[in-house]
Swiss-Prot record:
Residues that coordinate or bind ATP: 45-52
Lineage, opening ranks: Bacteria, Pseudomonadati, Pseudomonadota, Gammaproteobacteria, Enterobacterales
Protein name, per record: ATP-dependent RNA helicase RhlE
Similarity comment: Belongs to the DEAD box helicase family. RhlE subfamily.
Regulation: ATPase activity is stimulated by both long RNAs and short oligoribonucleotides.
Keywords (A to Z) from UniProt: ATP-binding, Cytoplasm, Helicase, Hydrolase, Nucleotide-binding, Ribosome biogenesis, RNA-binding
GO CC terms, sorted: cytosol
Reactions mediated catalytically: ATP + H2O = ADP + phosphate + H(+)
CDD domains xref list: DEADc (cd00268), SF2_C_DEAD (cd18787)
A Pfam family recorded for this sequence: Helicase_C
A Gene Ontology biological process term: response to heat
């Protein structure tokens, strides 16, 4: 199947071709025709499958096919909600790329930056608005944007929005929208909470599930190495050096842990940088660009800071510390093995993390293969201890960070960001992926009135 057969306009096809894409991915093959038919959609696809284009392309086709109901200033006709600033920036870049030859205006709004420039741009009229919920509600509260003409609503990474406690924000946004609209819900998994949200939001939706529920891509080779906690960094440096790994994304649980590990790896002679919410937008953007260009070999990240990162053909992901939430393991290793590429995911597991590993394997319904490098075997006399600061509080992309007015207070700055300038060379005939990488900016949270439960 080619993009030509999906009912997209020549101008959209031209833009897609200029990105070097020829063959739609499975999620695109199923989602694009359904959206063009006007169906509500409940789609589950892991990151890297091209899901962003799965809703962006038919959304643009819808807008150029139908004239807006309102006269005068362009109303917001398509609203895309995302949990983080970073993901919003990436989707916004996709929209701009694919609407290059269309008379379509788009805008990305999120917290962590001044609201005034966003208000000024909204005054000129916008067809497609990509937003984090908190900043969107700020703008609506200040009468900077009206949502009563929205024809298509997209909730992207809905599972993450629920995880981050943004359900009340979503409900408040829904009250601002017209009752008659098309709804598209995209999620990495079909959890029970997601299904409950879908029952209230969607009307007779088409369900698409490209990957099995809560499973890792078969293109990712997974391994576990048991090692004492105090020797993890030594083992990681050994494996990077011996294997001559040139591009490694490493996950830690905390921002402090990310900083400390990056410092230690640099002392080992391995060029590294940390990326998390306390880093300025400039620092995040530089680190990501340096990682993509090969100036640094290791990028150490927290879960939410790395959410939505798309680094082409990333060969190695390392869980320096296992996540407390098993589903986050799937999201982490989904950074590699994207589209048609293969990748390797390695987990360094100390005695404190054995239960976390069992939970992950229970979710995956299989045992992850073990490997052992001589000299790094764990000391059997060491007893397990409680994990300190184990469950990271979550943040996101609203006003200054999380976008959330919900019941959960995110940690400062674990949101997403603006788009990075660096972009790798495109290959001529690959499949259409999700998005391009982005950076992040942090600012102080402003006091705000509490939101009423919906």
């Amino acid at each position: 199947m080619s993009f030509d057969s999906l009912g997209l306009s020549p101008d959209i096809l031209r833009a897609v071709a200029e990105q070097g894409y020829r063959e739609p991915t499975p999620i695109q093959q199923q989602a694009i025709p359904a959206v063009l038919e006007g169906r509500d959609l409940m789609a589950s696809a892991q990151t890297g499958t091209g899901k962003t284009a799965g809703f962006t392309l038919p959304l643009l086709q819808h807008l150029i096919t139908r004239q807006p109901h309102a006269k005068g200033r362009r109303p917001v006709r398509a609203l895309i909600l995302t949990p983080t600033r970073e993901l919003a920036a990436q989707i916004g870049e996709n929209v701009r790329d694919y609407s290059k030859y269309l008379n379509i205006r788009s805008l990305v709004v999120f917290g962590g930056v001044s609201i005034n420039p966003q208000m000024m741009k909204l005054r000129g009229g916008v067809d497609v608005l990509v937003a984090t919920p908190g900043r969107l509600l700020d703008l609506e509260h200040q009468n900077a944007v009206k949502l009563d003409q929205v024809e298509i609503l997209v909730l992207d990474e809905a599972d993450r929005m629920l995880d981050m406690g943004f359900i009340h924000d979503i409900r408040r946004v829904l009250t601002k929208l017209p009752a008659k609209r098309q709804n598209l819900l995209f999620s990495a998994t079909f959890s029970d909470d997601i299904k409950a949200l879908a029952e209230k939001l969607l009307h007779n939706p088409l369900e698409i599930e490209v990957a099995r529920r809560n499973t890792a891509s078969d293109q990712v080779t997974q391994h576990v190495h048991f090692v004492d906690k105090k020797r993890k960094r030594e083992l990681l440096s050994h494996m990077i050096g011996k294997g001559n790994w040139q591009q490694v994304l490493v996950f830690t649980r905390t921002k402090h842990g990310a900083n400390h590990l990056a410092e230690q790896l640099n002392k080992d002679g391995i060029r590294s940088a940390a990326i998390h919410g306390n880093k300025s937008q400039g620092a995040r953007t530089r680190a990501l660009a340096d990682f993509k260009s090969g100036d640094i070999r290791v990028l150490v990240a927290t879960d939410i800071a790395a959410r939505g990162l798309d680094i082409e053909e990333l060969p190695h992901v390392v869980n320096y510390e296992l996540p407390n939430v098993p589903e986050d393991y799937v999201h982490r290793i989904g950074r590699t093995g994207r589209a048609a590429a293969t990748g390797e995911a390695l987990s360094l597991v100390c005695v404190d993390e054995h239960k976390l590993l069992r939970d992950i394997e229970k979710l995956l319904k299989k045992e992850i293969p073990r490997i052992a490098i001589p000299g790094y075997e764990p000391d059997p006399s060491i007893k397990a201890e409680p994990i300190q600061n184990g469950r990271q509080q979550r943040g996101g992309g609203g006003r200054g960070q999380g976008g959330g007015r919900g019941q959960q207070q995110p940690r400062r700055g674990e949101g997403g960001a603006k788009s990075a300038s660096a972009k790798p060379a495109e290959k001529p005939s690959r499949r259409l992926g999700d998005a391009k990488p982005a950076g992040e900016q942090q600012r102080r949270r402003r006091p705000r009135k509490p939101a009423a439960a919906q």
